[in-house]
Amino acid sequence: MAGNSIGQYFKVTTFGESHGPAIGGIIDGVPPGLSLNAQDIQFDLNRRRPGTSRYTSPRSEPDIVEILSGVFNEKTTGTSIGLIIKNIDQRSQDYEEIKNLYRPGHADYTYEKKYGLRDYRGGGRSSARETAIRVAAGAIAKKYLYKINKINIRAYLKQIGHIHCDFKDWIYVNNNPFFCPNPEQITELDLFIRNLKKLGNSVGAKVTIIAENLPIGLGEPVFDRLDADLAHALMSINAVKGIEIGDGFSAITKLGSEYRDEITSQGFQSNHSGGILGGISTGQPIIMHIAIKPTSSIKIPGKTVTNHNQETQIITTGRHDPCIGIRIIPIAEAMVAIILMDHILRFRAQCGDRKII
């Protein structure tokens, strides 16, 4: 299987399956001398891991990361960093009844048709379990980016179902299980998700990611534009079905006189472009929004076929999230960090004699 790596100068490769003994990754390109230990990575892993609230999958994984290589005396050596996270709470028996069925909306059908077989236990390689390693790699990138330029990457829940989350302040985002920036809406979100769980259903979401304090000049036209690479990375996350950068789809109804970001001696007067022009960062905040589909693993019967093309019905009985969007926040931050880290290193390789502004 190809497609297990992302990045050029900062390259992340992941391995492992949902119900295998472990998941892991190799991170190449981390400059030497960065202070790093497991606790630097663990904070974001704890934000992503399942079983931390009644609103997410009850699968209880501690997600303790172990650094296998590339760090000595809590400093990166410049060699490949190897990471591993043991899988502890697999319940493969939950999938025995559906091993010969294709779950609608999942990768079961396409994996088996492409490869001729599939790991039916929790989706195998297609499971979001793999994203724990992305979060670990992203935590390393975040630390480096903040160290060199105080680059800050944060995300929050913008919408869940019909509920739009009004932005109040970043201080609230990590203080509730929804990553909601408005404490006044927590009760409404709580009732909505609890009712969904009673119905055995799920719902989609919208997540906003903002990267700040970026230098001007990140991005490699024409095929490695910064916005193209960010879209690639964010669309690689399980369940993400759409992305916009800046005023993306809302630009359809705008006039050129409204949309263009006019410039004065004091800088840009607006940021409709979302911090990227011509595929290159402008130095303004990069603002991204992603759309997340509702999980297809629900307790409401649905039509499907067996691997012998016999029509039947399916009810998913495993442990799943009523809204995947709640857990995507740290994953989205990680993918943005990985891309920005890669482009920082690419900028230095090509334009090393120019100061990062």
From Swiss-Prot:
Q: Which InterPro entries match?
A: Chorismate_synth (IPR000453), Chorismate_synth_AroC_sf (IPR035904), Chorismate_synthase_CS (IPR020541)
Describe cofactor binding as the record notes it.
Reduced FMN (FMNH(2)).
Q: Give the top-level enzyme category.
A: lyase
Q: Does the keyword Flavoprotein apply?
A: yes
Q: Where does FMN bind?
A: 125-127, 238-239, 278, 293-297, 319
GO BP annotations of the record are: amino acid biosynthetic process; aromatic amino acid family biosynthetic process; chorismate biosynthetic process
The molecular function terms of the Gene Ontology recorded here are: chorismate synthase activity; FMN binding
> What EC designation does it have?
4.2.3.5
Q: Which PROSITE patterns match?
A: CHORISMATE_SYNTHASE_1, CHORISMATE_SYNTHASE_2, CHORISMATE_SYNTHASE_3
Cellular component terms (Gene Ontology): cytosol
Which residues does the record give as NADP(+) binding sites?
A: 48, 54
- Pathway per the UniProt entry: Metabolic intermediate biosynthesis; chorismate biosynthesis; chorismate from D-erythrose 4-phosphate and phosphoenolpyruvate: step 7/7
Name the cofactor(s).
FMNH2
The catalytic activity, as recorded, is: 5-O-(1-carboxyvinyl)-3-phosphoshikimate = chorismate + phosphate
Q: Which key words tag this protein in UniProt?
A: Amino-acid biosynthesis, Aromatic amino acid biosynthesis, FAD, Flavoprotein, FMN, Lyase, NADP
The answer to keyword rRNA-binding applying to this record is no
**Sequence similarity:** Belongs to the chorismate synthase family.
Subunit note: Homotetramer.
Its biological purpose is as follows: This reaction introduces a second double bond into the aromatic ring system.
Output this protein's name.
Chorismate synthase
Source species: Blochmanniella floridana
